[in-house]
Amino acid sequence: MQHVITYDQIEIMPYKLVRLHDFKVVKTVNDHARMTFTGIIDEHRRELYVKASDEDTQIKVFVTDGNGHRHPIFRGIAMEVEEHVVNGVHYLTVEAVSHTYELDIKRHKRSFQNPGMTYNELIHKIIAPYGKAEGQDMVTDGQAIGTFVMQYDETDWEFLKRLASHFYSPLIPAVGYGVPKFYFGLPMGLDKGEIDSINYKVNKRVADYQRATENHVPGVQDQDFIQYEVESVKVLEPGYEVTFRGQKLLVSEAVTEMRESVLTHTYKLSPRSGIRPIKNYNRTIIGASIYGKVVGIHRDKVQIKFKMDEQLDQSTDFWFLYSTIYASADNTGWYCMPEENDDIRIYFPSYREEECYAMSSVKRDAPAPAATPAASPASVVSGSRASGGGGSSSSVASAPAIPATSAAQMDPRVSEDRMADPAVKTLRTKSGKEIMLAPDKILVSSGDMYILISDSEGIAINSTSNVNIVAAADMLLSAKQMQLSADKIQLMGKGNTVTLDSITEFKATEVKMN
């Protein structure tokens, strides 16, 4: 379309204008296309246009060329509709934005934990809720994300723009459609021929070049940031390729507006390498701790189901490193992993989400059920869980009270509530194995068996099974007084035996009695 277009050849739906006064459309990379116009309307339509406008009001702009052909130059949704009256004349001013804005409204918090997922699959997963929305992947070439990716308090548009920047590429809205549509990266093969213009400007974007080199954008040269600004009657879109002054250039910005009653298009043209944004990161995630539940454990890594989303592929989800108290490269340190279904936190120390790691199992008490008139105080049994990684979670059940059997009964000095005293440190597994360090004692227990080392009462060993003591060398027992109590005591050495039973027996090759 290379004909001169005037006001009468512009149609803006759904508005019927008596006369169009001002009109402007701005299209650029990495942003939504925007349109504004002001026109005179009939007095009887003013309330209809203002009051009936909402987020579903779709705006279409067509121009009709000299051959009678209609061409769409903008489609979008109304953002602001205003009517003002000057000397009895009713003016309508409308601001609209392209349909890609629908991706830029709601913020999301969700994770993508499948390293084998391709960027193209991720793009389609994000835009799937938007009906017939379309995103054309022009840059990733089927590459997999290869790591953990987090969308944290970002709109889908912000998230997609950030992902595209990791390929040093922009998002480009396609505005001629009634649904969100965009290019993920600079399109190829959209050659629109040569532009002839005797009026143009040329400038060098020195600041943008410095920013690109300081942020290590690969393959850029200072000549890539020479930009031309030309006027043309051709209708072009950002991402289109043209030839100007013998160079292949891309349209990076298109401004369409009325000048002296003629529709004029002003384009900014740049080399392809000059339209390469620096890598963008989500810096709001720095220092965030996000709760999740452990669903898998292997060596020093865990699999996590985040509580903020429901995206989890059990076969291919991501393994997070678990931060332990101490670990070193020579395989020394403290190895204590959480258990499955434990609540845990994922910590993000930097703006790179792939650098996150798991830390700190978190005890969460189950909420007590609401009391009913029929319930008695004795009809509720509450269990709690000790601190440290591992173990079953707290539970509350409506059942008759059952006497508990635990280390607290074996040793009355041990409290059932292991978090009652901050001075008492405990390490307990879900199988009931426990080490307790109190100011006045140490307790190592397993069910009904325990070893108690008490400052006041000494050492107590209690076992429901055998106690075996084996020494490869000498064993020395020394005490002021020693008492051994058993149904039968037998001492053996080199074929000699002393038996203390209902009768006392001495068996040896030689027995001397003095």
Q: What are these language model-derived features?
A:
Residues M1-N514:
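Amphipathic alpha-helical and helix-coil boundary elements used as assembly
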